[in-house]
Amino acid sequence: MKNTTTFGRSNFDRRGFLKAGGVAAIGTLAAPALLRAQDGPILLGHLTPRTGFLGPMGEYAIMAIDMATEEINAAGGINGRQVQFIKEDSVNPQTASTKAERMIERDKVVGIIGEISSASALTISQVAERGKRIFINTGSNSDTLRGSDCKRHMFHVESQNVMYVNAEGSHFLKEGLVEGKNWYVLTADYAFGHDLLNAAKGFLGRHGGNLIGDDLVPTDATDFSSLLLNIRQAKPDLVALNLAGTQITSFFKQYGEFGLEFPIGGFGFDTISAWAAGAENFHGTWPSVWHHRVETEKSQDFVKRFVAKYGKPPENQAYSDYMAVMIMAQAIRETQGTDAAEIITYFENPETKFDMMKTREGYFHPETHQLLQEIYAITALPADQVQNEWDIFTTSGPLPGADQPLESLIADAVGGTCSFAS
């Protein structure tokens, strides 16, 4: 599957949608060939699952990419240059690697944005590192990608697992669901789930909780009946889910059918899962990097524009891909080019900030390339209080609280130590 989207050509305001400091230095002279290249189009790649259990989220990512490109086009482009997106279905890790290599070697993209699967993100990052191209990960949560598998050319707009665990864990602590309590955990059996499980175990151990059940779930699983019987017999204080994609929706529906009433929550979540389950089946409290009920002026304006274009509110994957485009556009605009080394320097500069449409600006952690930004906890509304198919949860304020630094979200990270190759 291949699509091309084009930004318009002309001058995008240097202070447009996102703010920043720390402009990278550039030379004042250039060879004629370089000048010609700088007058040509900027080509970027977008890889994300459009099929399989992550496909529904991938479709939101595509919608966001298209909307972002149209908005930049309407604002005049980036430094007078057109930008083209080559968009492909990443399918699986092997296919993602092949397509990333083709984008770099044949299509000559200057960077790649996207992905949701942690396994595919790893293979894309390996190709991007060899090709010295920026890769902005928009949906893969694995702590290992920020740890032992980190890459100098890879940056993460999506929050990592430990950030969700620390944010959601603070809610469970306040609710008295950790110390001395028994958890039953279900985990998606791939890199994302494994990382999330390790982070959750670490949190539970640090705060005096007990793990009484721990099951790995194949990513293609649709029948949870045997696991639900185990949960019923175990009688946990909390059912914690580290599932992904359509797994969560299926579990919600079957959990309700079994009539189980144990508190439920988890550390990995996408709002599309709540919508797909519906108000009657959606339960518990979950972390979210962003959702359509975030009460800031810019977030609500973004929601209105998205609804006007697509007839439904944006999901958190749409938010992450949209922000990745704007962050990449900011870097190209501020460095006056597409050189990967200059963009890395710009991203790593502690003065470089990004307007995340929240109460605080975000910035990349220079030692791991993780974007630090606020997170939210959403809680299912009782079905009789739901007014429409979208507004089926309430939201916390931004996490961490205003009195805590964003770095607190990455405390006690697992996944190994990041060491960028020189």
Give short role names for the model-derived ranges.
Residues K2-F7, F12-G22, L29-A31, A37-S422:
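Extracytosolic ligand-binding ectodomains
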